[in-house]
Amino acid sequence: MGDCGCSGASSCNCGSGCSCSNCGSK
């Protein structure tokens, strides 16, 4: 469970050790 699934500008699923552009670095 350390995946990042971004589908959309407001639909970001940030897990452990994931850094999305629209999500904060977690």
UniProtKB/Swiss-Prot annotation:
Q: Does the keyword Metal-binding apply?
A: yes
Report keywords, A-Z.
Copper, Metal-binding, Metal-thiolate cluster
Q: Which residues bind Cu(+) 1?
A: C4, C23
User: Which positions in this protein are listed as binding Cu(+) 2?
Assistant: C6, C23
Specify which residues bind Cu(+) 3 according to the UniProt entry for this protein: C6, C20
Q: Where does Cu(+) 6 bind?
A: C14, C18
Compositional bias (Low complexity) spans? 1-14
Metal-binding found in the keyword field: yes
Q: Where is the composition biased (Cys residues)?
A: 15-26
Q: From the UniProt record, which GO molecular function terms apply? A: metal ion binding
Q: Where Cu(+) 4 is bound, by residue?
A: C12, C20
- Chain spans, region Disordered: 1-26
Q: What induces it?
A: By copper.
Cite the binding residues for Cu(+) 5. C12, C18
Q: Which domain of life is it from?
A: Eukaryota
Q: Which family does it belong to?
A: Belongs to the metallothionein superfamily. Type 8 family.
Relay the record's extra comment.
Answer: The seven cysteines bind six copper (cuprous) ions.
Tell me what this protein is called: Metallothionein
Q: Which organism is it from?
A: Neurospora crassa (strain ATCC 24698 / 74-OR23-1A / CBS 708.71 / DSM 1257 / FGSC 987)
Gene (name only): cmt
